[in-house]
Amino acid sequence: MRKICLLITAFVMLAWSSVAFAQNVKVSGVVTDASSGEAVPFASVMVKGSMTGTSTNAEGHYSITVPKDGILVFSFMGYISQEVAVGNKAVINVKLEVDQQQLDETIVVAFGTATKESFTGSASVIKSESIEKMQATSVTRALEGKVAGVQLTTSSGSLSAKPSIIIRGISSISAGSSPLYIVDGVPYDGDLNNINNSDIESMTVLKDAASNALYGARGANGVIMITTKKAKKGQAVVTLDAKVGVNSKAARDYDYIREPGQYYEAYYLSRYNYFVNAQGLSSAAAYQKAASTITQSAKNGGLGYNVYTLPEGENLIGMNGKLNPNATLGRIVDYNGQKYYLYPDDWMKEAYKSSLRQEYNVSVAAGNDKSTFLASFGYLDNNGIIEGENMKRYTARLKADYQAKDWLKVGANMSYTNFTWNNANGSEGSSDTGNIFAFANSIAPIYPLYIRDENGNIMKDEHGLKRYDYGNAANAGLSRPVQSNSNGLQAVTLDKIQTEGNAFAGTGFAEVKFLKDFTFTFNVGVGLDESRTTDISNMWYGQFATDGGTISKAHERQFYYNLQELLSYDKTIAGNHHLNVLLGHENYTRDVYGLSAYKKKLFASNVTELDGAVVDGQNASSSRSSYNNEGYFARAMYDFDSK
């Protein structure tokens, strides 16, 4: 009777799980703009009341598995959210309506402002409330997933990596085409990592040719306009913002082979198929040849390493193509009188870590009918998800304006940044051995990370350093067929790439009103960026060990200035007809100076200057480049009843 009850209970549970599974349906569709019919990429698609969700792709398409009784919530910045009950629908296409409440907002456009309702171009605005919620170092990260038609790509996960931006609808067809950045009305050529997110009031992305026409060829790939905060009239306001968090690897990995046995099986199968199909061997002959060569050296078509212990005379892979059930992971090898223990390590686990991120910002703002004043200070201490990578940044900003006369207004905005970046990732190339992210992801799960003695203990060298397996015969005489003479994880602990520097940016303006409807504005902007990079490759291991280690120094200085003279006529006729005419002239100049030198054969491991190396690399160089742009432009805008 007890067995019957258990059987009935199991049957009921199975039936219940089947019913529950059947209640889930796969829904797909496309999200578009209700007025234009264009796709809305990266729109949020969430199951109401849960954490389940997805986003649309670049073409506005989505696919999600949801309960039949669920409700999907479609949303995107600038649009009214829409809820749709799933029911029995397999396809749900949604047309999002523009949020009309935002149309009266003033947005920053080329050389001026306009209301959203009267603006005829294509632009997206991100406010400070949205920017401050993000734990991002670069202001460009604030655009990620929040602006339709804007795609961000990064070649590595480095803290200092600068995302490439592609704006849909412009001439950009590759990540090499960057948009033009305008900060408080002036072109900005500095490092965007030097701008404190807490200082930003809004970011406007101009996406179409009409919106960017006044910037000429410079705006061909789109324009991103950054407006910094200013004080409001009223009592003094002191703001303190503190953020503490943890950085960790969040992106999911692809489903790839992680087990050593599965990797040997897959490699055996590829060799077996080759011998059968390309060389015409019989199944038995192909098995013998493939099974006997997979752990041999690369020149014999093998992987170079066998990390399994096998009974005498047995193959690692059986006739069925599966790992020998008698194989045990871990193998002791006697080589030149020294016993080594071969055991594969989890390279991903060793490469990544969780680390602390701290950010503190304080600001003081005050204003009255005549003037406003804002001062801010920020500190960021951000540690990366790999060993040896971190950054520190100090920022300060002063911004003020003064209504000297009814017809005269003046103002200034100055910012200073001091930064230090330690970039442990020697390369951002996806296939480079110096890129630890690529190295850890691509190396086969059969290879040891460390060199171990017969007891499994990690061996150390004469300097007290852990011995890493470089795949160059140092570990029991074995070599890797690929990624030989390299170990990205030891490189991040012994090598050093540090960039430190300072950045200053300042703008000023004078605005003169005359003849009631005319305004003349003079804008000036200057910027000075300087950075010093030290790149040290250790003297003991890796490709530069034969040189006794190397050190290179690079110093770059960039100075730019911008002058603008703008004359505008703004008139409202009969209450409904609004006309705005702009005439302008702009001159922009940028000079970049570079100096670099290289030496090798370091005196000691703690060398940080060229004097600490013996041999001159004979490749010291310097450079200078200049760029100048001058333009005259005009614009006329008309709207009726603000439409």
Model regions: which residues?
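Exposed, low-structure sequence patches enriched in small/polar residues
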Residues: 584, 633-639, 643
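Asp/Glu-centered strand-loop micro-motifs enriched in Gly/Pro and often flanked by an aromatic residue
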Residues: 347-352, 483, 489-499, 507, ...
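Short glycine-rich loop/turn motifs
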Residues: 359-361, 562, 629-635
